[in-house]
């Protein structure tokens, strides 16, 4: 457990939005990632966040040395890094989408396996049933010199229960590296992503970092850094978004209560909080039991326990259910 008196009061975070390479060119991501680490460190960043599956391996060979090179760069520039890759699962042709947290000594501190992959049955369908993305079964927080990091991946940010649990475990910032899609249609959900990032930050009184790969054909990214009070940084094009996270202000927001501002408004404008302070204390867990009850239409993330070939039946069931609604 980190003693908050020993934490740095501020930390500069760099969220990277790279022009990502896939397939036969995926090997190029490693050198590019190291260059981004240099750029971020030169800008004063202490923590660099890459997107889901970046620098890999993700779509190419499962061992390409990318993670080793990123660890070396993290050690050389004395920065923490969130990197992404695909890891082999326990069964043949199974994989985990993994968020790897590296400290400033270049050592891997955590390997978070995405607990809610984006419809693993759909992934199996798209890959002809040859490859299966399996879910992890553990949520993770990691203590760093600048605060406690809650690890997520991509659209898990849209699942409020995950963010709330990480907050209850003491997370100061939630880091959700995103994947990305090909083509211009993704721009339609860019603002939705940023709205969700701000919402998770405000409702949990945490900082939120989102990143995205820009694949060939991508038009706009969704990379952003949000505080409980406002959007601190965002980027549409390739590059880095940088923001300073203030832990002292975060502690002040968490320790105060909303009514204080109503009854006695602060004299200085900069002391007026742009969120609902004390929000994390306003909870009625005795009313939340339905959240953990089995639901008939809930997605079966562990269909592989019934046999990997059952993905077809699971997919058909979901598709038919969607048509019925």
Regions found by a protein language model. Give the residues of each.
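Short beta-strand segments enriched in small/hydrophobic residues
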Residues: 4-20
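C-terminal beta-strand edge segments of enzyme domains
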Residues: 131-132, 203-206, 212-325
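CN hydrolase (nitrilase-like) catalytic-core segments centered on the catalytic cysteine
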Residues: 63-83, 148, 154-242
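Acidic/histidine-rich helix-loop elements
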Residues: 19-28, 124-128
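Short amphipathic alpha-helices and their capping/turn segments at secondary-structure boundaries
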Residues: 1-5, 31-44, 161-167
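Short loop/turn motifs at secondary-structure junctions
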Residues: 12, 43-44, 148, 170
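Active-site catalytic loop in hydrolytic enzyme cores
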Residues: 90-177, 181-199, 219, 259
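Cys-nucleophile CN-hydrolase/nitrilase-fold catalytic domain and related Cys-dependent amidase chemistry
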Residues: 23-113, 181-199, 203
